[in-house]
């Protein structure tokens, strides 16, 4: 007996549309300012859902369901789907699409801005992401009290490549270092612009994000605060980033707050200007870690953790 053919989820458009999409141009004028680019290729839609490896007991969060081309496929596999939709017209279309079907009872639609919505518990997140909320969405997922087991997310190609970039890559940036601290990110597939209606101006990619378990024992705001400083100019030396007046003022303010919680406040005040002390502490940390002349764009997670720990040892904080 011959081998069964493998499913292929290429980003090449088949030219065939999901049936319920065929009348959409006469019903809607899509708002591209809201990132409304509806995925119309059924093979790509099915590929995205399959990569989530949904269990029958799973609750799936979908961000920006649109007219439901992903939603109806997720509903076939999940216990429940919570769909967060900003556009009331899209929510109404999705409601009509499942009305009178067994899937209707499994679908909950939350109408509103995803970034302002308090989310219920969910196991998996799937999203054809409105590109303007790509970064906020990723960090909201990462910082959930109980983050999803896995997220399968469609992004603008360049944004996806930034998530995946490694030290030394041209696209390696604060986003790369930050997300990779908390999650493992892998590339799933490229998706060409002709797979959408209306076609976006850029190509897309789907990525898989799995939150690390257990969560690294690092304060998110401290980690983020350090990266914001060193990646202001990723190709300048790290020491240059700490010479900025604005950065020194923030570091001094945080140091004062730290001293207020310890018994060392009077001692440090007696040593002279706090601003001067902060400068000296920064210089000492950078010299002792050997990172003074390194560039953030070449540094890895170990380098940044080493730097953060050394700053904390001398009472300097970033949040």
UniProtKB/Swiss-Prot annotation:
Any single GO CC term annotated in Swiss-Prot or TrEMBL for this entry:
preribosome, small subunit precursor
Annotated positions binding S-adenosyl-L-methionine:
37, 39, 64, 85, 113, 128
**Sorted alphabetically, which keywords does the UniProt record give?**
Methyltransferase, RNA-binding, rRNA processing, S-adenosyl-L-methionine, Transferase
In short, the EC number is: 2.1.1.183
- Pfam families named among the record's database cross-references: RrnaAD
Q: What class of enzyme is it?
A: transferase
Q: Which InterPro entries match?
A: KsgA/Erm, rRNA_Ade_Mease_Trfase_CS, rRNA_Ade_methylase_Trfase_N, rRNA_adenine_dimethylase, SAM-dependent_MTases_sf
Q: Which processes are annotated in GO (biological process)? A: maturation of SSU-rRNA from tricistronic rRNA transcript (SSU-rRNA, 5.8S rRNA, LSU-rRNA); rRNA methylation
The UniProt catalytic activity note for this protein reads: adenosine(1779)/adenosine(1780) in 18S rRNA + 4 S-adenosyl-L-methionine = N(6)-dimethyladenosine(1779)/N(6)-dimethyladenosine(1780) in 18S rRNA + 4 S-adenosyl-L-homocysteine + 4 H(+)
Which GO terms fall under molecular function for this chain's record? 18S rRNA (adenine(1779)-N(6)/adenine(1780)-N(6))-dimethyltransferase activity; RNA binding; rRNA (adenine-N6,N6-)-dimethyltransferase activity
| Similarity field | Belongs to the class I-like SAM-binding methyltransferase superfamily. rRNA adenine N(6)-methyltransferase family.
Role played? Specifically dimethylates two adjacent adenosines in the loop of a conserved hairpin near the 3'-end of 18S rRNA in the 40S particle.
What is the name listed in the Swiss-Prot or TrEMBL entry for this protein?
Dimethyladenosine transferase
Which source organism?
Answer: Eremothecium gossypii (strain ATCC 10895 / CBS 109.51 / FGSC 9923 / NRRL Y-1056)
């Amino acid at each position: 007996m011959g081998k069964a053919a493998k499913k292929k989820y290429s980003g090449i458009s088949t030219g065939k549309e999901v049936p319920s999409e065929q009348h959409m141009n006469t019903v809607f004028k899509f708002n591209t300012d809201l990132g409304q680019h509806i995925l119309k290729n059924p093979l790509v839609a099915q590929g995205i859902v399959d990569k989530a490896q949904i269990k029958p007991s799973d609750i799936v969060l979908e961000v920006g369901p649109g007219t439901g081309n992903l939603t109806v496929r997720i509903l076939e596999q999940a216990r429940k789907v919570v769909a967060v939709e900003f556009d009331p017209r899209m929510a109404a279309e999705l409601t009509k699409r499942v009305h009178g079907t067994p899937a209707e009872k499994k679908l909950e639609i939350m109408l509103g801005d995803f970034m302002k919505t308090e989310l219920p518990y969910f196991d998996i997140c799937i999203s054809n992401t409105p590109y303007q909320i790509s970064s906020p969405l990723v960090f909201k997922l990462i910082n959930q009290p109980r983050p999803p087991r896995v997220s399968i997310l469609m992004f603008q190609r360049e944004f996806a490549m930034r998530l995946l970039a490694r030290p030394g890559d041209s696209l390696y940036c604060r986003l790369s270092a930050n997300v990779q601290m908390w999650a493992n990110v892998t590339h799933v597939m490229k998706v060409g612009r002709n797979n959408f209606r209306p076609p976006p101006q850029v190509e897309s990619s789907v990525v898989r994000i799995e939150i690390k378990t257990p969560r690294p024992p690092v304060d998110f705001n401290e980690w983020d605060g350090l990266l914001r400083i060193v990646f202001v100019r990723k190709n300048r030396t790290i020491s240059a980033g700490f010479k900025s007046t604005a950065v020194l003022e923030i570091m001094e303010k945080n140091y004062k707050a730290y001293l207020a919680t310890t018994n060392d406040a009077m001692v440090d005040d007696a040593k002279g200007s706090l601003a001067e002390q902060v400068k000296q502490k920064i210089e000492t940390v950078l010299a002792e870690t050997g990172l003074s002349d390194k560039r953030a764009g070449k540094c890895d997670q170990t380098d940044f953790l080493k730097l953060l720990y050394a700053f904390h040892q001398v009472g300097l904080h970033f949040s």
